[in-house]
Amino acid sequence: MKILQQDDFGYWLLTQGSNLYLVNNELPFGIAKDIDLEGLQAMQIGEWKNHPLWLVAEQESDEREYVSLSHLLSLPEDEFHILSRGVEINHFLKTHKFCGKCGHKTQQTQDELAVQCTHCGYQTYPVICPSIIVAVRRGHEILLANHKRHYSPNGGIYTTLAGFVEVGETFEQAVQREVFEETGISIKNLRYFGSQPWAFPNSQMVGFLADYESGEITLQESEIYDAQWFSYDQPLPELPPTGTIARKLIHATLELCKAEHKCD
């Protein structure tokens, strides 16, 4: 990182955990002096709209008002990804100030996004935790679950199934395992859908579509409050926010349900 001078210029990412400082729902833009950033530490992490994009080191005390990244999912996808990148880099730098091998202090490397131990030279890169997320279809129906973290007395959000990939596991194996563990359902015809960085704090969501093969819903009660098959033409419960890969998977699956119904 460098110490900002008054004339340093560009777009500015200021983070507090997974919260960001925005001006009129946009990244602050201009010279450091005008945004009261002179003398703070920052690093350039790329460009945004043909101007430098700076990540400002998180301040312990800051009177600015910050907004949660989770409330910004409705922003254009490219802008949301920029904000997510800033949050993830900030999380990495905050949690890797000391070497995981010998315990001494680390410092940022000059030529890549990494930190290096000042004692043993061990180098660490940002940690990304791969997770799978899958929408399961059975004819005209989609499988949706109410996870315990989403439960509310009014029902809460119903969404697709998801989970972290375990050590030594392929994405495909993780999908099969998570669906069976959480609902007792076996699936087939698994195919890749898309991915989404998920900076809460450092996941990469890898999305799949799948078809039902066999089994009856049997809940993993430590994780799932409820799971049901919903027909595309019936009222649906509360769904994940627009902009999430979960919502995109649900939309794509409902379209497949409609297409199959037309062919019947």
UniProtKB/Swiss-Prot annotation:
One of its GO terms (molecular function) is manganese ion binding. Its EC number is 3.6.1.-, 3.6.1.22. A divalent metal cation 1 binds at A162, E182, E223. One of its GO terms (biological process) is NADP catabolic process. SUPFAM superfamilies: Nudix. A divalent metal cation 2 binds at E178. Divalent metal cations. Mg(2+) or Mn(2+). Binds 1 zinc ion per subunit. Residues 126-253 form the Nudix hydrolase domain. It catalyses: a 5'-end NAD(+)-phospho-ribonucleoside in mRNA + H2O = a 5'-end phospho-adenosine-phospho-ribonucleoside in mRNA + beta-nicotinamide D-ribonucleotide + 2 H(+); NAD(+) + H2O = beta-nicotinamide D-ribonucleotide + AMP + 2 H(+); NADH + H2O = reduced beta-nicotinamide D-ribonucleotide + AMP + 2 H(+). Zn(2+) binds at C99, C102, C117, C120. A divalent metal cation 3 binds at E178, E182, E223. Its cofactor is Mg(2+); Mn(2+); Zn(2+). It is an enzyme of class 3 (hydrolase). A motif (Nudix box) lies at residues 163-184. Substrate binds at E112, Y125, Q196, P197, W198, A199, F200, P201, N202, S203, A246. InterPro entries: NAD-cap_RNA_hydrolase_NudC, NudC-like_C, NUDIX_hydrolase-like_dom_sf, NUDIX_hydrolase_CS, NUDIX_hydrolase_dom, RNA_Hydrolase_NudC, Znr_NADH_PPase. GO terms for cellular component: cytosol. Keywords: Hydrolase, Magnesium, Manganese, Metal-binding, NAD, Zinc. mRNA decapping enzyme that specifically removes the nicotinamide adenine dinucleotide (NAD) cap from a subset of mRNAs by hydrolyzing the diphosphate linkage to produce nicotinamide mononucleotide (NMN) and 5' monophosphate mRNA. The NAD-cap is present at the 5'-end of some mRNAs and stabilizes RNA against 5'-processing. Has preference for mRNAs with a 5'-end purine. Catalyzes the hydrolysis of a broad range of dinucleotide pyrophosphates. Belongs to the Nudix hydrolase family. NudC subfamily. Homodimer. NCBIfam families: PRK00241.1. This is NAD-capped RNA hydrolase NudC.
